[in-house]
């Protein structure tokens, strides 16, 4: 819970991979996690956002969430806009209400997130499908293979460009295996990445050389 709260507040929530929708089982164990998560988030103070315009947009998004009757606020403090340092916001909503409200699918850029309570794996899958293309999906508790974990991995890979297991998504390593992109609207180019070694592919295009002379094929792709 503390790690997740820290991820949401990292950089005042201005990471494009900041967690925004957290699916939690609607049972007693889930209740305990949500309580600990809210307490951990309540104790954090994000630093100032990058500009007054970004802070104003954050405040408008949080105000829209506050006005949504489906939401139950869990962390709901306010902060003077002049400081540019917001207070984190967290609210809880049922899976059915989340799926039915397109307005709740819109990201609030900053330290704000929704806890969606799911009663089954089927509901969790329905929530993921309603969100649409995302940069990341993180799965917790998928250490053992089962029909349910395979189904969750399947929908996660269909939803996001990067699927994490038991971690938080705010760290984006520059590495050969990195994939920072995803199906629309997460990215307009889901077949490439903007971070990692393969990012150079965004600036390349294939060219076929038909019946090329020997001197050209001997260059093995080195430009003329």
Which ranges hold each PLM region?
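Conserved NAD(P)+-binding/catalytic subdomain of aldehyde/semialdehyde dehydrogenases
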Residues: 1-27, 31, 72
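Catalytic cores of nucleotide-enabled group-transfer and carboxylate-activating enzymes in metabolic
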Residues: 1-6, 10, 34-37, 152, ...
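Short beta-alpha connecting loops at secondary-structure transitions
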Residues: 19, 110, 184-188
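Solvent-exposed alpha-helices and their adjacent loops that cap or buttress functional pockets
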Residues: 13-16, 106-108, 157
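NAD(P)-dependent aldehyde/semialdehyde dehydrogenase
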Residues: 24-139
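Flexible, glycine/charged-enriched surface loops at secondary-structure junctions
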Residues: 12-15, 19, 46-56, 72-77, ...
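C-terminal core of ALDH-fold dehydrogenases
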Residues: 81-84, 121-219
